[in-house]
Amino acid sequence: MDDVYDMYRRGTELLEAGHHHQAAVPLARARDLAPDKTSVREALGRALFHIQRYEQAADEFRAVIERAPTNDFALFCLGRCLQMMGRHADARHPLALAACLQPSRRDYRVYRDRARARAADPPAS
């Protein structure tokens, strides 16, 4: 399993089967060997999100966005990571961009609106 594609394929198979922890292993190896592959980094970000490693997942989605700034899914996922970390004000921008890029995606609009509302009304301390 030395080939990046084989590691990516194995990781995505595990990811699709719901084995998120296991998927992160070959996907991280593939990322280390081919850090410029946005498909690998997006899949790794998804796996990390599912295992609640939101900061690391956000880093992967940022790397995708650096190379593909109009990747609506990566923008959406970055926004969701930021929301899960309680950073609703920071989540507004990527979620708004994702919703603009794909206006037919209701889920993008729902999470964009939630981030806006939470950022405007922070929890009481």
Regions found by a protein language model. Give the residues of each.
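Register position in tetratricopeptide repeats
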Residues: E16-A17, H50, M84, A117-D121
